[in-house]
Amino acid sequence: MTVTSQVKPEDEMLNWGRLILDGVSYSDMVGARDRPKEITWFDYWMSLANEYEQEAERKVALGHDLSAGELLMSAALCAQYAQFLWFDERRQKGQARKVELYQKAAPLLSPPAERHELVVDGIPMPVYVRIPEGPGPHPAVIMLGGLESTKEESFQMENLVLDRGMATATFDGPGQGEMFEYKRIAGDYEKYTSAVVDLLTKLEAIRNDAIGVLGRSLGGNYALKSAACEPRLAACISWGGFSDLDYWDLETPLTKESWKYVSKVDTLEEARLHVHAALETRDVLSQIACPTYILHGVHDEVPLSFVDTVLELVPAEHLNLVVEKDGDHCCHNLGIRPRLEMADWLYDVLVAGKKVAPTMKGWPLNG
């Protein structure tokens, strides 16, 4: 028997902490919650994106480019969160609008985001690089999105890293954002991370010996595999990630539909088989040779067995494990503290060059 969720998508998957920490204003969230019944979730956010864009155009006319960039960034986030819950034409419409708005925002941001047009195996892969102020060369952090999150969503985390003297690079890989049209979710994401490393090592503003990777949610899975397979990476953060999808049965109905969508298959069983194979990392985790920070919330949908896997397979001398007893998925419910701690850890490793000692915080749970 097929069980269909009766919960609205915005109630099933919406995490207020995530959206607010990523830059969506509390007032906009309240507006979405309290919107008139005749206005859909999608239409509310797309209309709001238009309003932010219009205000940005007014700011440009007045010579206030910095404010315009912030407003366009807000517009892009509105388009992102309009579409990320759907698997029909709304997804494509919102995605295209988000890309358009972010392209407008990019040169107006502080620091600006420069778009580099890469091609990997014949597939176009735009990469945005932001360089911090001050003399270089600078360390850099490659940021990886998740199941429905894309490069534009990392803006606030980028800013924390940039403020600490590190450059950032963002892109969409297989099954994500701009690349989804060309390639479904696949088991070779590390190839695309390595292509970004190739790009960064050619930039005079970047320190070749201090490039790290940070991945959120599914991106945390990608970060672990990238660190295992790309020896040029000097640091790795898996932020609410996982090592495998053995826990498929624990996923929500909407998350399973999302896996099906990015797999470009017709049935949930086909999706399960595809992503289970594509996202397996346990065979390579022992190859990780750089400092690795893993953040996991006890109340995450990803089971605590992930922690056992990490402790068994990731070399102990490289591991910094943080388990938050009150944390949800990616610990979005804990405010900015976990993000600051990750940014500071990256600073210690990549900027200050500290030899971070292996640590375990919050584990074992009753320890």
Curated annotation (Swiss-Prot):
Pathway: Alkaloid degradation; nicotine degradation; 2,6-dihydroxypyridine and 4-(methylamino)butanoate from 6-hydroxypseudooxynicotine: step 2/2. Keywords: Alkaloid metabolism, Hydrolase, Plasmid. Optimum pH is 7.5. It is an enzyme of class 3 (hydrolase). The keyword Hydrolase applies. Its EC number is 3.7.1.19. It comes from the Bacteria. Changing S217A: Total loss of activity. Changing E148A: 98% loss of activity. It catalyses: 2,6-dihydroxypseudooxynicotine + H2O = 2,6-dihydroxypyridine + 4-(methylamino)butanoate + H(+). GO terms for molecular function: hydrolase activity. The active site is at E148, S217, D300, H329. Belongs to the AB hydrolase superfamily. Homodimer. L-nicotine is used as a growth substrate. Plays a role in nicotine catabolism by cleaving a C-C bond in 2,6-dihydroxypseudooxynicotine. PANTHER family: CONIDIAL PIGMENT BIOSYNTHESIS PROTEIN AYG1 (AFU_ORTHOLOGUE AFUA_2G17550), DIENELACTONE HYDROLASE DOMAIN-CONTAINING PROTEIN-RELATED. This is 2,6-dihydropseudooxynicotine hydrolase. It comes from Paenarthrobacter nicotinovorans (Arthrobacter nicotinovorans).
